[in-house]
Amino acid sequence: MSKTPSNPALSQRSDMVVFLNGEYIPADQARVGIATHALSYGTGCFEGIRAYYNSERDQLYVFRALEHFQRLKRSCKIMNIDLPYTPEELVEQLVELLRRNDFHENCYIRPFAYKSDEIIGVKLNDLTDHYTMFAMPMGDYISTAGLRCLVSSWRRVDDNMIPARAKISGAYVNSAFAKSEALMNGCDEAIMLTAEGHVSEGSAENIFLVVGNEMITPPPSENILQGITRDTVMELARRELEMLTRERVIDRTELYTADEIFLTGTGAQIAPVVEVDHRSIGTGVVGKVGGSLMSLYGDIVRGRREEYMHWLTPVFDKKPAASNGSNGHVASNGLNGSNGAKTKRGKQTTEA
């Protein structure tokens, strides 16, 4: 079993600042009641966003921030949650949060919109909606040295049960069952099938197979999250490797005969798979395509490829430009009622 990095925790620093209901407050003052609807029923939706530190430029770059918040808005629409900010405003809030925490290391951001009433009863309508966001240092979420995977006995929930195109908090118990099964059986990660027995995705990652000179991946109709890293990899494969990606139904046994397999996700980044169900994939080591994409991705997210800078939002630039269409304005004196000044904190200069 390959070594899996330890899980990050918000408590790694005592001076963390979070965003809650329009204000930036100390993390230890952010409280949610024990009867909160979302805590009992999973009635919330979230995003996972990464920011990468470039020590040469002393700059922190948020990767594809606008696209993440556009997806969050879509998730909120499905969940009947009123999120009263535009995606561009949400990017501004994120940048301000990172500035206030003065991160000089790779980090992970978790925006979360949820049903906040403290009541008993299963419904989505006529409830109060709240929004929060926090950030924490984060290196590798799962190993990138080569994963051993298990095809899970737990099937991916269907769109007419809990829609996978929305990042719904309650839906992730499905992933937790699958991931725990894999870990308890000596593997690193789970691969989940649909109810029909087709390949869907990992516990929290999209999946790609390399077969000959093409990549294949399950289509959205196979109950996958339409991942932003997935979209990134498809574009990079086309532009940089001259490889097309075909979206199609994939049978379980195709996993065993693939030349390469890798998982993609904001947390996972690009994680090669070297074994599935005790069968070596390809030569049993990280493959050429996966390795090339990992290297390319690592440079892009740290601002080392100028042609992809439109995907990045710099945090410490005085005039940062949010990715793909944001007006780039960031309020330095707080947003939505907060007037707290930024506190300078000690730098940590680690790169994953």
Question: Where in the sequence are the language-model features?
Answer:
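Helix-start/capping segments and mature chain N-termini
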Residues: 1-85, 89-96, 119-352
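Short, acidic/charged, Gly/Pro-enriched secondary-structure junctions
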Residues: 90-108, 112-119
